[in-house]
Design a protein with these regions (language model features):
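Core catalytic region of metal-dependent phosphoesterases/phosphodiesterases
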Residues: 1-59
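Active-site neighborhood of phospho(di)ester-bond hydrolases with catalytic His/Asp-centered motifs
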Residues: 1-7, 52-54, 96-100, 117-125, ...
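Solvent-exposed loop/turn segments at secondary-structure junctions
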Residues: 7-11, 57-59, 73-76, 101-104, ...
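Short, electropositive alpha-helical surface patch
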Residues: 25-33, 69, 173-186
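Active-site-proximal loop/helix segments of hydrolase catalytic cores
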Residues: 74-89, 97-118
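Conserved beta-sheet core of the metallophosphoesterase superfamily
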Residues: 102-185, 193
């Protein structure tokens, strides 16, 4: 497996007005207590998962070569894409990016580097969606990603595919999900996608 950290790996939840997610916060974060992210890191790497926080890895599965790269959490401004920037290895059959929060600065940088697919989370699928608007439009993404991309597999013209998992959780202070059920994603990749 591959992983990067998100804000809720570093800090626990804190009560806040749920309507505050509908407005830009200017980068001001109300953080809860610090969590044992070092222990989480040790546990994940101890079972063989690859840490992609500001790292690039080349993985060979049978005859398929995958290059993966990732960033630390953009929501907390811990991302520094320059540490992993550059075109993929020419031998790679697939180049993927992993980031917790799908901020446009990260997606655009990964696109400039010709990645094929980007995995992200953070949005909870919008957590509250309006099913009667378009194809169920999210009210917010909690980042600068357009709300129509808050969950699932989407693609802009001449851009990599983006898969945003709606995830499993909610805040213990706002235990609601409307038209955005919890999910675990399984993508099957086929040659020539």
């Amino acid at each position: 497996g591959l992983f990067v950290f998100g804000s809720n790996d570093y800090y626990g939840p804190k009560p806040k007005n749920p309507f505050s997610y509908l407005f830009k916060d200017g980068g001001r974060r109300k953080l809860g207590p610090e969590l044992d992210w070092k222990g989480l890191h040790k546990s994940l790497t101890g079972i063989g998962w690859l840490d992609l926080n500001h790292s690039r890895e080349v993985i060979k599965i049978n005859d398929t070569i995958i290059e993966a790269r990732g960033t630390d959490d953009a929501h907390l401004n811990l991302d520094n894409y320059s540490e992993v920037a550059g075109l993929p290895d020419k031998k790679a059959h697939l180049a993927i990016g992993v980031t917790h929060a799908p901020y446009l600065r990260i997606l655009e940088a990964m696109s400039r580097d010709n990645l094929d697919l980007i995995f992200a989370g953070h949005t909870h699928g919008g957590q509250v969606r309006l099913p009667w608007i378009g194809e169920s439009r999210a009210l917010t993404t909690n980042c600068d990603l357009p709300t129509w991309r808050a969950r699932g597999l989407t693609r802009e013209p001449n851009q990599p595919w983006l898969h945003v998992s709606a995830g499993m959780g909610t805040s213990p202070f706002a235990r609601i999900r409307v038209a955005s059920p919890p999910e675990v994603s399984l993508l099957t990749l086929e040659a020539g996608f």
